[in-house]
Regions:
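Short acidic-hydrophobic, aromatic-tinged amphipathic segments that line or gate anion-handling sites
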Residues: 86-87, 198-205
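Small-residue-centered hinge/linker elements
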Residues: 1-178, 208
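Short, acidic, Ser/Thr-enriched surface-loop or helix-capping motifs
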Residues: 189
Length: 210
């Protein structure tokens, strides 16, 4: 789990999960406030583990409030189980889906006279293709598409369940963000509230009053 600010300590996943579980069983703790403004993200499996733990915490009847100046996709996955999600007035939620890129070195190796021999057999033996090809093979494209499509389906399912959104709402938001922003005068925050991704827009200085 990574944070942007250098003075923010990186959090061990297991320590975080244990802390949430401990807070659930501590009668002195009424709820959790999560500031995700400097959150850089983590692997999807890690994000889902934290989300699942927060969902379990919420079942205890305690509140969860999540805040961010602007929610990245990773931050929003973690925020999704919250009782209330708050963003800065000029903030909002940025959802992008997943993508994959590779650097290919064959053309460079050809220029310097270096030949790479890849000994492999069968389909989907693509680990060294970036050394022997100039672009991504169909096998590699297909396996990456299948992988990221399945991950994205799980992510959207979790968000839609936690936010009580209709199935397909997240894909609609992502695929139509240009029209959604135009409808809301280019205001990410207002668009995010309209589509029930966040609940309130509050300045950081007003959070305590809120």
């Amino acid at each position: 789990i990574f944070f942007q600010e250098t003075n923010t300590p990186q959090i061990d996943l297991h320590q975080l999960l244990n802390a949430i579980d401990g807070a659930k069983n501590d009668n002195k703790i009424l709820g959790i406030f999560i500031d995700l403004s400097d959150f850089l993200g983590g692997y999807p499996a890690e994000l889902l583990k934290v989300t699942n733990q927060l969902e379990d915490f919420k079942l205890s009847g305690k509140f969860i409030i999540a805040y961010s100046d602007f929610f990245s996709q990773s931050a929003y996955v973690i925020a999704s189980p919250s009782t209330e999600i708050i963003s800065y007035p000029s903030g909002g939620v940025l959802l992008q889906g997943f993508s994959s890129k590779r650097l290919f070195f064959k053309d460079f190796f050809d220029k310097i006279g270096l030949e790479v021999i890849n000994l492999s057999e069968g389909q989907f033996k693509t680990a060294f293709e970036n050394l022997t090809l100039s672009s991504m093979s169909d096998d590699d494209k297909n396996q990456r598409l299948n992988l990221f499509s399945n991950i994205w389906k799980e992510i959207t399912k979790v968000i839609e369940r936690n936010r009580e959104l209709n199935q397909g709402s997240i894909d609609y938001y992502l695929n139509n963000i240009d029209q959604i922003l135009e409808k809301n005068g280019g205001d990410w925050g207002r668009a995010s509230v309209e589509y029930k991704l966040i609940d309130s827009l509050v300045k950081r200085g007003d959070l305590e009053k809120y």
